[in-house]
Amino acid sequence: MSMRAPQLDWLRPGQGSGLRFVTAIGIVAVFLQVTLIPRFDIGPFAATPNLVVATVVAVAAFRGVVVGAIFGFTAGLLVELLSPGDTLGVLAIAYVAIGAWCGRFASGSEPIGRVTAVLLVVAAAALVPIWLGTVGLLRGEGPPVGYLLGHLVIPQIVLAPLMALPAWWAARRLLGAPREVEPWLVPT
């Protein structure tokens, strides 16, 4: 029994809502982040490039605020569940804010180019350690501000462009042109 072309439309990248590919991109990004991406130790700086932040920015830019926020929450929660950490949900909240913010930024009249995407990833990657440090300070166990900025934020800013373009390319290839997707609305 052979399948006709219309039955295979959901397998083609860029067709439909792309939510299957959003799920696949998220699972691959979280898996790579938790297992394969190396930790760089350069002098006093030690950091791991954040592929999940770059993927959240790319998905939010191509699918809008709602999908970006939901994707950010689930990716952040998966990273927290799969890697050792202390407080569950802190990273997920940061990724929700990043997904919603980047989705809102991308919903303008002009499509986002590669340079703007890299700048968004750099800004988002810098916000994650600031957020984690702020939550740590509120709990009374965070790092000093100088250490936070000098040893946590700057390495993320330097390493973020390494992850930005591969994540952007994968999202563009699999999701197609940017468009708003509301997952719970049924087309009429």
Annotate the PLM regions.
Residues 1-188:
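Terminal, non-globular segments
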